[in-house]
Amino acid sequence: MRRPLVAGNWKMHGTHSSVADLIKGLRQLALPSGVDVAVMPPCLFISQVVQGLAGKAIGVGAQNSAVEPMQGALTGEIAPSQLADAGCGMVLVGHSERRLILGESDEVVSRKFAAAQSCGLVPVLCVGETRAEREAGKTLEVVARQLGSVIDELGVGAFARAVVAYEPVWAIGTGLTASPAQAQEVHAAIRAQLAAENAEVAKGVRLLYGGSVKAASAAELFGMPDIDGGLVGGASLNADEFGAICRAAGS
């Protein structure tokens, strides 16, 4: 039985003061015992969040890490070893905003995945299609390519210690959400692609849906057989809304 996971991606939001307020709200949440919960603040606030959530059953992750595992001469980047030292347990890899706006290639994403894993972090591999790709009927082809690039580089066994998040790009920050049936179709295809290489790995890997996840739609999405939780964006900046999504995963 796969344990649900709800992870909040705070993106490029927050000040020292607003993060303190959000931590206070998160500490007051009654969270379901059967769900893993994590938040991913901007790097600047990771230590503040780790300290502020000490003793609360909420993990802390990062939104990005470097292609090299150890610290060194790579100006502006954060090594996964540094993130682990700061108290992070997981890290997003290949988020669509980084692929599309910053030009991260499948090769770079694979390198970041491997570097993170080598430092004991759980990579959360983000895959998903644009609106144009969906309208062209290429959704499954695009997702298979993004997933396959990591399988080809690192082997399917790497996914025994990883999470995959399907995030339809057209639904991120737009208020649009893939229907439960649309999301399930892609999640089933992801699991089938992994199962073609290793059935046990496919059975155990957690697949998250990310794309304007809200409390109102969460329960129906999480009720799908291959959706094991959510990668939550804007809604994770509101403690009460985020808590409601976590409870939906526990139901």
Swiss-Prot record:
<dbReference type="GO" id="GO:0006096">
    <property type="term" value="P:glycolytic process"/>
</dbReference>
<comment type="subunit">
    <text>Homodimer.</text>
</comment>
<feature type="binding site">
    <location>
        <begin position="9"/>
        <end position="11"/>
    </location>
    <ligand>
        <name>substrate</name>
    </ligand>
</feature>
<dbReference type="InterPro" id="IPR000652">
    <property type="entry name" value="Triosephosphate_isomerase"/>
</dbReference>
<dbReference type="GO" id="GO:0004807">
    <property type="term" value="F:triose-phosphate isomerase activity"/>
</dbReference>
<dbReference type="GO" id="GO:0046166">
    <property type="term" value="P:glyceraldehyde-3-phosphate biosynthetic process"/>
</dbReference>
<feature type="binding site">
    <location>
        <position position="212"/>
    </location>
    <ligand>
        <name>substrate</name>
    </ligand>
</feature>
<comment type="similarity">
    <text>Belongs to the triosephosphate isomerase family.</text>
</comment>
<feature type="binding site">
    <location>
        <position position="173"/>
    </location>
    <ligand>
        <name>substrate</name>
    </ligand>
</feature>
<dbReference type="GO" id="GO:0019563">
    <property type="term" value="P:glycerol catabolic process"/>
</dbReference>
<keyword id="KW-0413">Isomerase</keyword>
<dbReference type="Pfam" id="PF00121">
    <property type="entry name" value="TIM"/>
</dbReference>
<comment type="pathway">
    <text>Carbohydrate degradation; glycolysis; D-glyceraldehyde 3-phosphate from glycerone phosphate: step 1/1.</text>
</comment>
<dbReference type="GO" id="GO:0005829">
    <property type="term" value="C:cytosol"/>
</dbReference>
<comment type="function">
    <text>Involved in the gluconeogenesis. Catalyzes stereospecifically the conversion of dihydroxyacetone phosphate (DHAP) to D-glyceraldehyde-3-phosphate (G3P).</text>
</comment>
<feature type="binding site">
    <location>
        <begin position="233"/>
        <end position="234"/>
    </location>
    <ligand>
        <name>substrate</name>
    </ligand>
</feature>
<dbReference type="InterPro" id="IPR022896">
    <property type="entry name" value="TrioseP_Isoase_bac/euk"/>
</dbReference>
<dbReference type="InterPro" id="IPR013785">
    <property type="entry name" value="Aldolase_TIM"/>
</dbReference>
<dbReference type="InterPro" id="IPR020861">
    <property type="entry name" value="Triosephosphate_isomerase_AS"/>
</dbReference>
<keyword id="KW-0324">Glycolysis</keyword>
<feature type="active site" description="Electrophile">
    <location>
        <position position="95"/>
    </location>
</feature>
<comment type="pathway">
    <text>Carbohydrate biosynthesis; gluconeogenesis.</text>
</comment>
<feature type="active site" description="Proton acceptor">
    <location>
        <position position="167"/>
    </location>
</feature>
<protein>
    <recommendedName>
        <fullName>Triosephosphate isomerase</fullName>
        <ecNumber>5.3.1.1</ecNumber>
    </recommendedName>
</protein>
<keyword id="KW-0963">Cytoplasm</keyword>
<keyword id="KW-0312">Gluconeogenesis</keyword>
<dbReference type="GO" id="GO:0006094">
    <property type="term" value="P:gluconeogenesis"/>
</dbReference>
<dbReference type="InterPro" id="IPR035990">
    <property type="entry name" value="TIM_sf"/>
</dbReference>
